[in-house]
Amino acid sequence: IYEAKLPRALFIIDTEKGTLKEIHSDSAWLNHVQFSTTDPDLLMFCHEGPWHKVDRIWTIRLSTQKTMLMHKRTMPNEIAGHEWSSPDGKTIWFDLQQPRSTTFFVAGADVKTGKEIKYSLKREEWSIHFNLSNNQQLFCGDGADPGQVAKAQNAQWIYLFRPNGDHFDAEKLVDMKHHGYKLEPNVHFSPDDKWVIFRANFEGIEN
């Protein structure tokens, strides 16, 4: 799909009027659309494909159809992805590796200015997915098995991360060594931030 460079489009649907409107077209593989958590006029989307070949994370303002690149790669084999919007809608957070499988960060880009902040973490703390608490004070991660991009041997944990300067301090919450990571845990916080919620198959086969 990535190599084909076929014409593609983003569109929105008015659920009250039942109308469809095209808002953006490109030959890139457009994918992973997410509305802002607070601004219904702002949509995040991605140029999908091999992460080391694409500047992946973009936004588009529906009222003007103006697009903005959220993170531009700065070195060979750099990857950024698994992006999500902060609860207040001001930041897009993502997994950043500079370069791939070598140096690991969780980074955030301001949706208005593009200014970035990033927190480093250890190889064994890298997670397939990260998420942010509703009060925006804590992060969580779902770990990974040795077959994932970090190739870590002791990363099969549900993690709680506390930002500390330019890095994360990690706390291990759940041992996932009996979980099969073909089912990605996809961590997130409960609305009151008292729980980290995740999927797991260590008690049996998932449906």
Predicted segments — roles?
Residues K5-A9, H52-W58, R100-G108, Q148-Y159, ...:
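Structural motif
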Residues G89-K118:
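N-terminal leader/targeting helix
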Residues I13-W29, I60-I79, A109-W126, F161-L183:
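Multi-bladed beta-propeller domains
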Residues I1, S25-C46, R73-D95, R123-D142, ...:
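Conserved beta-propeller blade repeats
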Residues A155, F161-N207:
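Short hairpin/turn module used for nucleic-acid contact or packing/dimerization
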